[in-house]
Each structure stands twice: as structure tokens, then as C-alpha cells.
From Swiss-Prot:
Domain of life from the UniProt record: Eukaryota
Protein source organism: Homo sapiens (Human)
Record gene name: AP3S1
Oligomeric form and interacting partners: Adaptor protein complex 3 (AP-3) is a heterotetramer composed of two large adaptins (delta-type subunit AP3D1 and beta-type subunit AP3B1 or AP3B2), a medium adaptin (mu-type subunit AP3M1 or AP3M2) and a small adaptin (sigma-type subunit APS1 or AP3S2). Interacts with AGAP1. AP-3 associates with the BLOC-1 complex.
Protein name per UniProt: AP-3 complex subunit sigma-1
Cell compartment(s), UniProt: Golgi apparatus; Cytoplasmic vesicle membrane
Keyword vocabulary terms for this entry: Cytoplasmic vesicle, Golgi apparatus, Membrane, Phosphoprotein, Protein transport, Transport
GO cellular component: AP-3 adaptor complex; AP-type membrane coat adaptor complex; axon cytoplasm; cytoplasmic vesicle membrane; early endosome; Golgi apparatus; intracellular membrane-bounded organelle; presynapse
Length: 193
């Protein structure tokens, strides 16, 4: 099971943290600091797996990470997870971010944190891997983006309706409105203009 997913830069600033087990906020901050110190001290040419720190569960857990440019992508997992499988999952995550943001960088993670969390939620839920097919993940994210855009259009609908009514050129104000069998009497109103 995946216990946490952490992304931080070369200076230890967290850019994303997702915990799948309950930890207090102080403990989460300690885990992030400890993980950064463990991972950042390692040479580039060494293995990308190491035993979890004391806070994340000790020797029963592993830290699996990759370092891309200025960012560390770290998955904290228990012993039931495959190290190579998680390395591949990190690669899929980074490539998916790259497709969604067209050459992802640290600023994308800062300014589009909600979208990054959506991408991550398509891949991992409750510490379990849901999807590893990058094309399927991108398709789902594109569908979410289209839905958000269509909902944004609905938010302005009342204002557009009021504007349309104000701009209507009626020769006179109707006194009765007939809709099918229903007749509605319109009270005397001042001019719309």
C-alpha cells in the first residue's frame, strides 16, 4: 500500500504532499523533512529505493524516489509494493503531468495544484493504484476539464438572461403571457429602458 506521495524541490520545499494514512500535521511536516534529508543526501548513481525513515514506519516501509530536474518525486510504501512497479508508476505520473502541462515544471505544480491532485487521484486512491495507462488518465483529465469549462459557462447564464431581457425591443409591454393553457397576467411595470 502507498502511505504517502511527496514532491519537493531541491531545497526541501514541498510542492505536493498526499498522505493515505492519518498523521497529525506536525508529524506530516516531520515526515516531509526527514524524507527530504534521506533522499537529498544520496548520490545520483545509487539505487532509488531506501528504507523508510523512523516516522514513516522504519524498516517495514520503503521510500522509492526519482529526481527530475529540480524536483524529487517520492512514494512512501509498505513492503507489499513492488519497488520497480512504483518506479514505473512515478514515471507514468511524471509523463502524464508532462502531457497535461506541456513540459511540466515546478511552477505548474505550484499554480495548478488542484489539477495535479486530480491527475494523482486518477492514478492512486486510498493508497491503492487504480490506473497506470497514461492515455486513459489523460482522457479522464480532459473530460474533467471539459466539464469544468461547461459548468463555468452555466455560471454566467443568469447574467446573460437578464442582459437579453433588458436588450429586447418590445413595441409594448405585454399584459398577458400565454404558455399553452396557462395565462399569466403581467402587472403594470415601468419601462425596461
Amino acid at each position: 500500500m502507498i502511505k504517502a506521495i511527496l514532491i519537493f524541490n531541491n531545497h526541501g520545499k514541498p510542492r505536493l504532499s498526499k498522505f493515505y494514512q492519518p498523521y497529525s500535521e506536525d508529524t506530516q511536516q516531520q515526515i516531509i523533512r526527514e524524507t527530504f534529508h534521506l533522499v537529498s543526501k544520496r548520490d545520483e548513481n545509487v539505487c532509488n529505493f531506501l528504507e523508510g525513515g523512523l516516522l514513516i514506519g522504519g524498516s517495514d516501509n520503503k521510500l522509492i524516489y526519482r529526481h527530475y530536474a529540480t524536483l524529487y518525486f517520492v512514494f512512501c510504501v509498505d513492503s507489499s509494493e513492488s519497488e520497480l512497479g512504483i518506479l514505473d508508476l512515478i514515471q507514468v505520473f511524471v509523463e502524464t503531468l508532462d502531457k497535461c502541462f506541456e513540459n511540466v515544471c515546478e511552477l505548474d505544480l505550484i499554480f495548478h495544484v488542484d489539477k495535479v491532485h486530480n491527475i494523482l487521484a486518477e492514478m492512486v486512491m486510498g493508497g491503492m493504484v487504480l490506473e497506470t495507462n497514461m492515455n486513459e488518465i489523460v482522457t479522464q483529465i480532459d473530460a474533467q476539464n471539459k466539464l469544468e469549462k461547461s459548468e463555468a459557462g452555466l455560471a454566467g447564464a443568469p447574467a446573460r438572461a437578464v442582459s437579453a431581457v433588458k436588450n429586447m425591443n418590445l413595441p409594448e409591454i405585454p399584459r398577458n403571457i400565454n404558455i399553452g393553457d396557462i395565462s399569466i397576467k403581467v402587472p403594470n411595470l415601468p419601462s425596461f429602458k
